Amino acid sequence: MAVTGIVAEFNPFHYGHKYLLEQAEGLKIVAMSGNFVQRGEPAIVDKWTRAQMALENGADIVVELPFQVAVQSADYFAQGAVDILSTMGADTLAFGTEEDLDYSEIARIYEEKAEQMTAFLETLDDSLSYPQKTQKMWESFTGIDFSGNTPNHILALAYAKASAGKNLRLQPIKRQGAAYHSQEKNQMMASATAIRKHISDRTFVLQSTPSSELLLMAPQVNWENYFDLVRYHILSQEQLDHVFQVNQEIANRLKSAIVHVHSIEELVDKVSTKRYTKARVRRILTYILVNARENNLPNGVHVLGFTEKGQEHLKKMKKSISIVSRIGAVPWDQQTQTADRIYQLGHSDIKEQNFGRSPIRIEKLG
């Protein structure tokens, strides 16, 4: 039986995600972001709610990406997630994409020319952002056209790069429904962006998300729930460059801007430049919020939930890797657990995220 790995955020889970799980083969393992996501923002609902939505709609196992993997640029996000899925026994990597490309060939090219491609990046002007440099690299070595690029396309290339040299079959699945950033409500499959924007429209949410009651009943947050905390950190700390990925230039820009803004989006708009993209600034604000440091990644894999079929696979994997099913006095990953405690500050109804929590168990459906 195939073991298919899927990297996801499910922010929140919607019918496009359900379609992807339906198209994937065999046992399906999801490596999912925790309470903070790749583009640098708090997840709309907590990791346990999102994991349960996935398990009720086709996933067999959901494991958590550590904070330092989940809140990263595309390449680091993809590499960390693919490494975890490989250790979990995945032989196939399924992912959504808008483009009809031969990702296996792209992975082969990167495996053969990784050194040259990395050296090429070093020759590019520092005024370019890292995503712009990466696009130029792919254009030069593979001829890919980025004129209509989208986040899923960028991530798909990052997955191909991360899978180079690994025994992984790549299974790209064409995205269905609304575009990634679409805020439209009249689409057959609404995007996560649209669902977050219109979360107060109960009828729309019921139409757009499977297991929608889980989403509607869970405490919901966004960046504005944490703005005062971010402002406090920026104003009260004399130096910010001890925080992960914060240099003196960005620290100065943040300290200058924070006294003039009244929201996270205003702050991001004031601080971002061609070099410091909005996504990068949001990630930096997330690092400041949780006081992140550069740390080693945890050895164990934290399991958020599983089905009966998933449980059988986990029993086999316990012989070769460390499976963390319950977090007690000894931390799984201190940085992730600190981030979770801060996430709880965004809403008084968010439950404890780690201590005493056991994996969600879903009985066989249908």
From Swiss-Prot:
Keyword Ubl conjugation assigned: no
Annotated InterPro entries: Rossmann-like_a/b/a_fold, tRNA(Met)_cyd_acetate_ligase
HAMAP family reported for this sequence: TmcAL
Lineage: Bacteria, Bacillati, Bacillota, Bacilli, Lactobacillales
Pfam families (UniProt xref): HIGH_NTase1
Keywords: ATP-binding, Cytoplasm, Ligase, Nucleotide-binding, RNA-binding, tRNA processing, tRNA-binding
Binding-site positions, ATP: 7-20, 96, 152, 175
Catalytic reaction equation(s): cytidine(34) in elongator tRNA(Met) + acetate + ATP = N(4)-acetylcytidine(34) in elongator tRNA(Met) + AMP + diphosphate
Free-text function comment from the UniProt entry: Catalyzes the formation of N(4)-acetylcytidine (ac(4)C) at the wobble position of elongator tRNA(Met), using acetate and ATP as substrates. First activates an acetate ion to form acetyladenylate (Ac-AMP) and then transfers the acetyl group to tRNA to form ac(4)C34.
Localization per Swiss-Prot or TrEMBL: Cytoplasm
Full protein name: tRNA(Met) cytidine acetate ligase
This protein's encoding gene: tmcAL
Record field: transmembrane: none
Matching SUPFAM superfamilies: Nucleotidylyl transferase (SSF52374)
Entry GO MF terms: ATP binding; ligase activity, forming carbon-nitrogen bonds; tRNA binding
Disulfide bond annotation, renumbered to this chain: none
Sequence similarity: Belongs to the TmcAL family.
EC number: 6.3.4.-
The organism's place on the tree of life at top rank: Bacteria
Species the sequence originates in: Streptococcus uberis (strain ATCC BAA-854 / 0140J)
